[in-house]
Amino acid sequence: YLGGNIGIPLFTKLNEIKPEDLIVLELSSFQLMGMKVSPDISAITNITPNHLNVHKDYQEYINAKKNIYRNQKDTGILVINADNDLTRECQNDAKGDVILFSSKQKLDYGFIVENGIVKECNDGIRKHIVSQDEIKLKGIHNLENICTALALTKKLVNTEKAVDTIKEFAGVHHRLELVRTLNGVEWYNDSASTTPTRGISALKS
C-alpha cells in the first residue's frame, strides 16, 4: 500500500490492510509532529527550512522530522543523507541500523552517486548498480532518490528486480513531469517544487 502526503489517505484501506502487508508512506512534518510510533524502516532525504507557517520555529520543524525514527526499535533501519548536516547528525541517536547515501562523499558502506552512476559500497568496495543514462528520470537529486529507495528496500527486494523497476519508472505527476516538446523545447510541470531547494534541484536537472 502507498499513501500519506501524496494525496492517498490510507484510512479508507484500514479494513483491507493485513499485519503482513507492506506500507509505504510519505510523511510531512505536521503529520509527524504528534506521532508516538515510527516506521520499521525510515528515510530522511534532507532537512531544510519548510512549512514554517505551520511550525513555531525551525527547531520545531526539525524535531518533527526526527519523529520518523525516534521511536524505532533496535531492529529498525534509518536511511539518511550524508551530505546534509542535519540529517547526518540523526545517526547519533538512531536506535537501529543506519544506511547512508551521498552524491558528494566516499562511503565505506551505503550508496553513492559517482560520475552519474549509483553504486553500492560495502567495506569500501563499490558495485555498479545503475547509471543516469539507463533511467528515465533527470537530475542528480533523482539519483539520490534512487539511492534512498535501494537502501530502504535492501532487505526486502532483490536488487536486480529493483533496478528493472527503476529503469522503467518515469516519475510522478507534478515533479519534473514532461508535458510536451514544442519546436525542440521540452516543457516540464514541476509544480510540486514548493521550496527554493526543490526548485534549484529541478533547474539543475
Task: Give the location of each predicted region.
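Acidic-glycine-rich active-site phosphate/pyrophosphate-binding loop
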Residues: 112-130, 172-180
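Active-site-proximal loop->helix
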Residues: 12-16
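Short beta-strand-centered segment that lines the nucleotide-binding/catalytic pocket of NTP-utilizing
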Residues: 1-9
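Nucleotide phosphate-binding/pyrophosphate-handling subdomain across enzymes
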Residues: 131-205
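Beta-strand->loop->alpha-helix junctions that form or flank phosphate-binding loops
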Residues: 3, 95-114, 163-167, 177
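Flexible active-site lid/hinge loop adjacent to a nucleotide/diphosphate
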Residues: 6, 17-101, 113-114, 119, ...
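Short glycine/serine/threonine-rich phosphate/pyrophosphate-binding segments
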Residues: 8-10, 27, 195-199
